[in-house]
Swiss-Prot record:
Belongs to the GTP-binding elongation factor family. EF-G/EF-2 subfamily. The gene is fus. SMART domains: EFG_C, EFG_IV. This is Elongation factor G. Its main location: cytoplasm. It is found in: Cytoplasm. Catalyzes the GTP-dependent ribosomal translocation step during translation elongation. During this step, the ribosome changes from the pre-translocational (PRE) to the post-translocational (POST) state as the newly formed A-site-bound peptidyl-tRNA and P-site-bound deacylated tRNA move to the P and E sites, respectively. Catalyzes the coordinated movement of the two tRNA molecules, the mRNA and conformational changes in the ribosome. GO terms for biological process: ribosome disassembly. CDD domains: EFG_III, EFG_mtEFG1_IV, EFG_mtEFG_C. It comes from Streptomyces ramocissimus.
Length: 341
């Protein structure tokens, strides 16, 4: 057990409440787990980790780096639950996501230093979201396909509405009565709706904050199947979402800038120019602290800009705060770019 200092570590025999220490050799322990005495077991409440708000594409520079990159990503993801990775189905690229530009820069640097991986990294991409602003009371969709032999048939009637709580991204409610849709097909409708939410209808970004209610439907004893109802659920959701006033959401970052008072005007003006909202200003240890909410898309390159405007005398920190609706003129540009227009 070690107490960590800036340039050294100190071995200690025991730790008390509130101590922060490093423990060596825990090969079976992962982030979020609780360690306790076997005789007095205790489990602390699990931590909630936010979803990534920024993504970059990463690819190995050579075939030799391919395997090392996979190992590095796996190890880093085990350590840091806020770091996520997936493959883009259309391009085949590996996409890594994190909580900010600096977060991903540090992870890529660790890949190079600790795992000897040389990789090409793309430009950061903001993880936008889509949601709806209006309820749609009834949308009916029938999936019907007839080829030689057994066909496909499923009819669903759904309603969708926005979820006001920001903590819930999706809900599914079943209100079918009288066996109009057999119980074994209900989860397929749910799965179809969730699949459709992965790619929103405005610009293909994941959707959030939607409640789907299955109202009614119909089936065929021979031609109906789980696949048919999944397709019907997916298509019904897409049709309903188009009618529900879809909007684009962007991640907002809580930004805190510490600056000498002489540069307060420059700092505030710069935040305002980035579509930011000043939340508070206070004094701390002889310096001024400016707190605000700024769209993540406007924070790229902020380190250099802040250094330039304050002669290197200001510093800042930021963390994800929430998602907010993108202004119409900005949303139109984002949607056009996503569609390649």
């Amino acid at each position: 057990i070690y107490r960590m200092h800036a340039n050294k570590r100190e071995e200690i025999e025991s730790v008390g409440a509130g101590d922060i220490v490093a423990v060596m050799g825990l090969k079976q322990t992962t982030t979020g787990e609780t360690l306790s005495d076997e005789k007095s077991p205790v489990i602390l409440e699990s931590m909630d980790f936010p979803a990534p708000v920024i993504q970059v594409a990463i690819e190995p520079k050579s075939k030799g780096d391919q395997e090392k990159l996979g190992v590095a990503i796996q190890r880093l993801a085990e350590e840091d639950p806020s770091f996520q990775v997936h493959s883009d189905e259309e391009t085949g690229q590996t996409i890594i996501g994190g909580m900010g530009e600096l977060h991903l820069e540090v992870l890529v640097d660790r890949m190079r230093r600790e795992f000897k991986v040389e990789a090409n990294v793309g430009k950061p991409q903001v993880a936008y979201r889509e949601t709806i602003r209006q309820a749609v009371e009834k949308v009916e969709y029938t999936h019907k396909k007839q080829t030689g032999g057994t066909g496909q048939f499923a009819r669903v009637i759904i309603a969708i509405e926005p979820i006001e709580s920001g903590d819930t991204s999706y809900e599914f409610v079943n209100k079918v009565t009288g066996g109009r849709v057999p119980k074994e097909y209900i989860p397929s409708v749910d799965a179809g709706a969730q699949e459709a939410m992965q790619f929103g209808i405005l610009a293909g970004y994941e959707m959030t904050g939607v409640r789907v209610t299955l109202l009614d439907g119909a089936y065929h004893e021979v031609d109906s199947s789980e696949l048919a109802f999944k397709i019907a659920g997916s298509q019904a959701f897409k049709e309903a979402a188009r009618k529900a006033k879809p909007v684009l959401l962007e991640p907002m970052m809580a930004v805190e800038v510490t600056t000498p008072e002489d540069y307060m005007g420059e700092v505030i003006g710069d935040i305002n120019s980035r579509r930011g909202q000043i939340q508070a200003m206070e004094e701390r240890a002889g310096a001024r602290v400016v707190k605000g909410l700024v769209p993540l898309s406007e924070m790229f390159g902020y380190v250099g800009d802040l250094r330039s405007k304050t002669s290197g005398r200001a510093s800042y920190s930021m963390q994800f705060d929430s998602y907010a609706e993108v202004p119409r003129n900005v949303a139109e540009e984002i949607i056009a770019k996503a569609k390649g227009e």
